[in-house]
Regions:
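Intrinsically disordered, low-complexity Ser/Thr/Pro/Gly-rich regulatory segments
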Residues: 1-223
Length: 223
């Protein structure tokens, strides 16, 4: 088992520009250092259904209401500000920005558990005698004897049979070579939504760790 940088094609060049957008880093930083309530707020706003601030203040009174503790409201307002910036992007760009934010958030949380120089982005995993996958993995942890591969999705709709098969194949091929590879799907959506989506899938999922919005901080836990 070995890792390789993804091909630098036109799509990769465009997406690299999205990843380098300062908004991605600011949003990931806020989301990495907050709790589940704020992440739910961010997800709701970033969906782009409304860019009206007062609409969200009314919908999240326990975070943004006038009687909320100052420190909580200040943090929520910061999350709302960044989320509104994302929501105001055009549909296609917004989708790419959201994906880049979840990838960056994943990398930042992993960096609390493993050395930062072992975390890589947009990497393929190669196995002897096996055709390489077309799509690279969003985030990988590359350590001798203990590797990890993560695909990142904005919502549960991103849980497709193709994604699950690719993750399961990588895990299986690694085991065939006597290598350790943990595979996971990070989904910035509710656990229940992920469960409903998985229930409709026919792809193997038993060996794939699903990391929903409620469990993001587990990636930073002791490993």
């Amino acid at each position: 088992m070995r890792f390789q940088d993804a091909a630098r094609d036109g799509r990769a060049v465009v997406y690299a520009g999205i990843q380098a957008d300062p908004l991605v880093a600011r949003a990931a930083d806020l989301l990495a250092n907050t709790d589940g309530r704020m992440r739910v707020l961010a997800r709701a706003v970033m969906n782009g259904e409304s860019t009206d601030r007062e609409t969200w203040v009314a919908m999240f009174p326990t975070l943004l209401g006038a009687d909320v503790r100052d420190d909580i409201r200040t943090e929520a307002q910061a999350v709302l500000d960044v989320a509104l910036e994302v929501a105001q992007r055009g549909d296609a760009v917004r989708s790419q920005v959201r994906g880049a934010i979840i990838e960056e958030l994943t990398a930042r949380l992993l960096a609390r558990r493993v050395p930062a120089d072992t975390i890589r982005r947009e990497r393929r995993i190669l196995f002897d005698g096996v055709r390489s996958e077309i799509h690279p993995y969003d985030v990988t942890v590359e350590r001798d004897g203990s590797a990890e591969a993560y695909d990142c999705k904005w919502g549960a709709r991103g849980i497709s049979d193709d994604v699950l098969y690719q993750l399961d194949d990588a895990r299986t091929h690694a085991a065939d070579e006597g290598a350790s590879l943990d595979v996971a799907l990070v989904v910035f959506d509710a656990r229940r939504s992920c469960a409903v989506r998985l229930a409709r899938s026919t792809a193997p999922a038993d060996g794939i760790r699903i990391v929903p919005l409620e469990s993001l901080d587990e990636m930073a836990g002791a490993g």
